[in-house]
Amino acid sequence: VVIVDCSDYPTHGCTLELKPICGSDNQTYSNKCGFCNAVAQSNGTLTLSHFGKC
């Protein structure tokens, strides 16, 4: 299981950096910050599927 540490990311104001992450919801997030915001909104139910586009 791969885990992303979301403690370094704000709940808003992500950069436009493109480093895609595929979530367990089969949605591609543009970077760790965007993914971490989605994790927070899902109350922790969203997990990392893999790095890169889904």
UniProtKB/Swiss-Prot annotation:
Question: Localized where?
Answer: Secreted
Question: Record's GO cellular component, any one?
Answer: extracellular region
InterPro entries from the UniProt entry: Bifunctional_prot_inhibitor, Kazal_dom, Kazal_dom_sf
- GO terms for MF: serine-type endopeptidase inhibitor activity
Keywords of the record: Disulfide bond, Glycoprotein, Protease inhibitor, Repeat, Secreted, Serine protease inhibitor
Q: Which cysteines are joined by disulfide bonds?
A: 6-36, 14-33, 22-54
Q: Which residues form the Kazal-like domain?
A: 4-54
Q: Would you list which residues are glycosylated?
A: 43
Name of the protein described by the UniProt record: Ovomucoid
